[in-house]
Amino acid sequence: MGFYQERIITQPYKMQNMTKKEFFKDAQFLVFANRLNEVALIFAGIYILFRWKSLPVHVPPLYLHSFTSFSNVLSSWCQYEALKYVSFPTQTVCKASKLVPTMIMGRIVRKRQYSIREYILAFIIVFGASIFFLSSTNQIKRESNDKRREEINSAISGFILMCGYLLLDAFTPNWQKKLFEQPPRLHTSQMMFAVNLFSVILCLISLLQQGTLLTSINFISKHENIFVDCLLLSLGSAFGQVFILMTVKRFGPVVLSLLMTIRQILSIFFSTYNFGHSITLIGFFGLFTVFGAIIVDIYSKYRINTGRRLR
């Protein structure tokens, strides 16, 4: 999915029957297309329709799901928009360090306490991510003054957008967890349906208010390959939700964390190969510091869970 995100945001598309190429600039339309993913929305709706008698009563007011949708939509917009200013590998390493904002939001939203080990892990991950980010900005020094100023402004813009993404993305699961904890417990399909529905409504209102819905559709209709890329991105997002839920249900969150970490590492190398990004030796050190800490944490959680089951 990351491949298509980067391709749509950073690569120009050729107009049909012409040699002219243009960039697709409306990140919000991509958020709308992803949240419109019929697979998640329709299947959740059908499941609720046919199984409503066996599902728990929906206790939380429906408007509470709009908070999840709002943070989810804004975090996705920040993620797509940031690709205009920072590379996909830089963005992925920053996303891997979202443990820190997740802990902050967990403390604020759910009053959760964290252990010393978790604080140390968070510090190591932030340290590695900072090294990786600074290694990419150090390459700016080799540019001319005007080019350097432009690159610095882009790096700052990308950093601000990634901070927005991390904070909003950290709020989303903590708020969902809070809703899930209210008895009787919500079913996953109820959560998926409500969040996707509110997200579609929020994006549609914003696109109509800005007048960019029709211009984005017009761009897609006049340029080659972008429709297929948007479709694959949307389907990847939808089936990704299903994959996450099935993995957690069958194998547990530890296996999911390991798979997601491996996916992130592979996506960085895949992006570097396909889009010509360069990573310095210092950048590789920061990269392996971040993902090494994450893998060690996953392994320690696995050992703890295994020990509890054997008792």
Language-model segments: what does each one mean?
Residues 1-311:
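Polytopic endomembrane small-metabolite transporters, centered on the Drug/Metabolite Transporter
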